[in-house]
A protein has these predicted regions:
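Glycine-rich phosphate/ribose-binding loops and adjacent secondary-structure elements
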Residues: 213-271
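N-terminal ligand-binding/catalytic initiation module
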Residues: 1-226, 236-242
Length: 271
């Protein structure tokens, strides 16, 4: 688990050793995202391929373009499964094992890998942590480049992320954020479901939910507090009581986030 796993070239093209020999097989032992909507026109599909290939040296485009075109056809997205790391376990490792120049960067690397841990993530190989579309990155190239930047970053630099795309390391100072993240920066007039599907398929926008694209997913515990307050206020408003003692609370919410409902109900006194 060394720095070579995250090394990138200064041109921002991925080191060929990262992907040339990697597996192309889809792992059947984990859940996978459903096929996304086929919404792109033919010119837009060409643009999606161009956007995906920007991460690679031009010499490799002829090899990768057909493969990425097949992913776009089969899955509705270009995930770059070839680049999924298989030489180390995807999980939150002890912070001192990360090849980083500052501890904050190591912590962020740890958080990213926790979000992509198969035990944690909903569709880990499609980089979806929760909610069906809560993405950490849009593709595995972005993962490698971001981890490479984090391994190089000092406490006088800030990494800027735009919907999974690493814009680069910028000079800052120790009191500045180590990472500035935006996801789904779209104005309301262009934010329909089809707009999202199109822009995500093009590789120019992603939906990071609240804690997937910000690298800090902690499951239902992250919303237990707010859910408890909501349940208590519902009791006050509709039942004219201060808690749910003696009330049977029925919910189908038992998933990664909605599981907070059962916990909140118990905290509020329900049975």
């Amino acid at each position: 688990f060394g720095i070579s796993n995250f090394t990138i070239l200064h041109t921002n093209n991925l080191d060929r050793g990262t992907f040339i020999c990697n597996t192309l097989d889809i792992d059947p032992t984990v859940d996978h995202a459903p096929r996304r909507k086929d919404i792109l026109t033919l010119p837009e599909k060409r643009l999606a391929l161009q956007n995906a290939l920007r991460y690679f040296h031009p010499e490799d485009h002829a090899m990768l373009a057909p493969e990425f075109a097949n992913e776009l056809r089969d899955y509705g997205r270009i995930y770059m499964h070839r680049l999924r790391p298989t030489d180390y376990e995807m999980r939150a490792h002890p912070i001192d094992t990360y090849p980083a120049k500052c501890r904050q960067a190591a912590a962020i690397m740890l958080m990213i890998q926790n979000n992509l841990d198969p035990v944690v993530a909903q569709f880990p190989h499609e980089l979806i942590t929760y909610g069906g579309n809560g993405a950490v990155f849009q593709n595995w190239a972005q993962y490698h480049i971001a981890m490479g930047y984090l391994s190089q970053m000092t406490d006088e630099q800030t990494l800027v992320m735009y919907s999974g795309h690493p814009l680069g390391l910028f000079p800052s100072h120790p009191d500045a954020p180590r990472v500035v993240i935006t996801n789904g920066m779209v104005i309301p007039n262009h934010s329909t479901q089809d707009d999202y599907e199109r822009m995500n398929a093009l590789g120019v926008s992603q939906y990071g939910q609240m804690t997937a694209g910000s690298y800090m997913y902690i499951g239902p515990q992250g919303i237990v507090h707010g859910t408890t307050i909501t349940v208590l206020n519902a009791a006050r408003k509709y039942l004219n009581r201060d808690d749910l003692a003696g009330v049977t609370y029925v919910t189908s919410g038992l998933g990664g986030m909605s599981g907070a409902q059962a916990k909140a109900a118990v905290i509020a006194g329900a049975t």
